[in-house]
Regions:
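Positively charged n-region of N-terminal signal peptides that target proteins for export
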Residues: 1-4
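A short, well-structured beta->alpha microelement
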Residues: 50-70
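Charged, low-complexity C-terminal accessory regions
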Residues: 22-27, 33, 146-180
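Short, charged N-terminal beta->alpha structural module
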Residues: 27-52
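Ser/Thr/Gly-rich flexible loops in soluble cytosolic domains mediating phosphotransfer, phosphorylation
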Residues: 95-129, 171-180
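Structural recognition of alpha->loop->beta junctions
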Residues: 124-156
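Bacterial N-terminal signal peptides
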Residues: 7-18
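A short, gly/pro- and small-residue-rich
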Residues: 86-110, 157-164
Length: 180
């Protein structure tokens, strides 16, 4: 019985921490751009979740620096998919170059950048980790499916920047509603 109550208390605490951390992310300013780094399906999932939350985002799979400069907020979904690379005709080198371009433009134009990783532990392979290493320093805030943070990578890498750990991907809808 003690284990049951301890589990309930721990779950409630994690939920409260997630909500408290969300306050570190400012209200979303429009227009909002949604793009992918790594061409995994996560950005498509994020697009659907944003629609359900009634948060308007322009989804551009291959956004470039010129695109970014037109937006006040940018969500970048990071996760490498070899199938996505093949379908898109890109590779790690071309995605790295695009990443550098969009982050340079975001900094120059003052675009608030939120890194999103909702693929879970399955999207923490070697290539995704390389893309994350490129992207993490440039983000202003992070929204991560908590299973992807089992090793504490995002907690450590985020440092003092806002980090929201979601227990379920569907919790993104509530978070987006809070931020709009």
């Amino acid at each position: 019985m003690k284990k049951f109550f301890a589990t309930i208390a721990a779950t409630a605490l994690m939920y409260c921490i997630g909500i408290a951390q969300a306050t570190g992310i400012p209200q979303l300013k429009t227009p909002i751009l949604l793009t992918s780094l790594g061409q995994a399906a996560d950005a498509h999932t994020m697009s659907v979740l944003a629609k359900r939350a009634k948060v308007p985002m322009d989804f551009k799979t291959f956004a470039n620096g010129t695109d970014v400069s037109k937006y006040k907020t940018m969500f970048v979904c990071v996760g490498v998919s070899l199938k996505g690379f093949g379908s898109a005709g890109v590779n790690l080198d071309t995605e790295t170059a695009r990443a550098n371009d969009i982050f340079k433009s975001a900094k120059a134009s003052g675009t608030y950048t939120i890194l999103v990783h909702i693929g879970g532990s399955e999207r923490r392979d070697q290539m995704s980790n390389k893309m994350l290493e490129i992207a993490m320093p440039h983000a202003d805030a992070y929204i991560v499916y908590d299973q992807a943070n089992a090793d504490g990578y995002f907690t450590k890498s985020a440092g003092s920047k806002p980090l929201v750990l979601l227990p379920k991907t569907m919790k993104m809808i509530n978070l987006l509603k809070e931020l709009k």
